[in-house]
Amino acid sequence: MAQADLRCVVAAGDQVGESPVWSKTDGSVYWTDVCRFLVHQFAVSDETFRTWIFDEPVVALSLSSEPGRWLVALGSRLIWWWPTTDRRVDHGFVLPGYPHVRLNDGRADPLGNFWIGSMRNNLMPNGDLTSAGGTDGVMYRISPAGQVSEHINGLGISNTVCWSPDGGTFYTADTLADAVWAYTFDVRDATLGQRRDFLMGYGEGLPDGSAMDAAGHLWNCRFGGGGAVRVAPDGSIDRIVRLPVQDITSACFGGDDLKTLFITSAAVLHHSGERLAGSLWALACDTPGLAPNLVKIAP
């Protein structure tokens, strides 16, 4: 895809930009800076930019079935958040084993459950990064009623939480293992089945967050690889997009037609000459993406 299709939207200077989510209601993309405990909003129509600060790392965001109400994953727990008033209320889920481990990437499934992975905690109380390692990570599913279940164990850095357009395949990654896997997903009871290797040892950076398009292709961001790859359902590489920064972290589709791929990046490793590291980027795509799944609010 031509470089002309890529532009820097916000030079946010994020230490670790993550978890972009498109909100159709206000025509905005929201995303986080994990290390600075921030949530950003960029409104596309008037190009306004807003930021909120939280009391610990903000690792993932999800819209809910109640307009204006978000689920926010912090390093240690989940909270409900209403951006218009900045009201914040504990969800009830607290990560077992924190602060040895922390939460990381997460999203809602087609049934309204929230899936989120954990990892060994590599963040100091002030947000500075330390080295990550181990296989302490767990993939959790939290139901609308608040029931918690474990579905994958032994993860290094849990990343990528995506579903195929028909909901029948779940994609997830372990950054430390340089692996993206595809699981069969039962849309009746939100359980995982057989696992297959999907993108293993690709060689250009390591797998971070991803986005799914309407054709069933997974766009995987490559931390340290300076780009994103579009991967067909059979695991073959369909397209490679280069960015002028090395550490690409996550992506989501947005815009009125869902044909803009918003991409987050990280400045925390201070690569020489990367003045736009930590920016939010936008890539014009021919194939639209999927609208975000919503966390279901229990009656």
Predicted regions, residues:
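Residue position within the beta-strands of beta-propeller blades
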Residues: 30-32, 72, 115-117, 171-173, ...
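Loop/turn-rich, solvent-exposed surfaces of beta-rich toroidal or solenoidal domains
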Residues: 178-179, 183, 199-236
